[in-house]
């Protein structure tokens, strides 16, 4: 009898784990092989992505900075080029990222759930298009490699935070 009870408990536990929905996914890494690794994984604890700063020059994406909630991440990349800054509307999220690269990142296009296309950089190179694997998930943070330019980018998707006291 004890064996039957333990077996039933084990099966119930296994089936409960099997039906838990997965929500996180990863796209990338898009770009070349150089640069020093960076990750904003800890920044997502400050809240959802609320703004983007992208530095561009004639040919490449030079640098990136992302605002999570009300807190800006560390800047990654170089200092030469024009800095562009775009704020998301309250409750707006990035649901797709496309772009182009060769040895370095050349173009980024962030698409939001409000239908906005936020485009940075030049239209040349190998194309990529990244979307989350799971429904109802959004861009939560970025990672990649950088030096004097953005060498590569990775995109991390998950559910929009249900609450954010610092947003």
Swiss-Prot record:
The UniProt keywords, alphabetically, are: Cytoplasmic vesicle, Extracellular matrix, Golgi apparatus, Lectin, Protein transport, Secreted, Signal, Transport
The protein's name: Zymogen granule membrane protein 16
The task this protein performs is described as: May play a role in protein trafficking. May act as a linker molecule between the submembranous matrix on the luminal side of zymogen granule membrane (ZGM) and aggregated secretory proteins during granule formation in the TGN.
Q: What is the scientific name of the source organism?
A: Homo sapiens
* Entry keyword annotation includes Iron-sulfur: no
| Recorded GO MF terms | carbohydrate binding; peptidoglycan binding
User: What Gene3D superfamilies does its record include?
Assistant: Jacalin-like lectin domain
Q: Name one Pfam family in it.
A: Jacalin
């Amino acid at each position: 009898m004890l064996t039957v009870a333990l077996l039933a408990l084990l099966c119930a536990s296994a089936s409960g784990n099997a039906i838990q929905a997965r929500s996180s996914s990863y796209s990338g890494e898009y770009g070349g092989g150089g640069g020093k690794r960076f990750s904003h994984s800890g920044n997502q604890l400050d809240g959802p992505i609320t703004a983007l700063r992208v530095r561009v020059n004639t040919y490449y994406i030079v640098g990136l900075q992302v605002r999570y909630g009300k807190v800006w991440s560390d800047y990654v990349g170089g200092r030469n080029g024009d800095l562009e800054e775009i704020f998301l509307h309250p409750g707006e999220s990035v649901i797709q990222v496309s772009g182009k690269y060769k040895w370095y990142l050349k173009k980024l296009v962030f698409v939001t759930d409000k239908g906005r296309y936020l485009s940075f950089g030049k239209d040349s190179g190998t194309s990529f298009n990244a979307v989350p694997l799971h429904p109802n998930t959004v861009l939560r943070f970025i990672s990649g490699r950088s030096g004097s330019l953005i060498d590569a980018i990775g995109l991390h998707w998950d559910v929009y935070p249900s609450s954010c006291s610092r947003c």
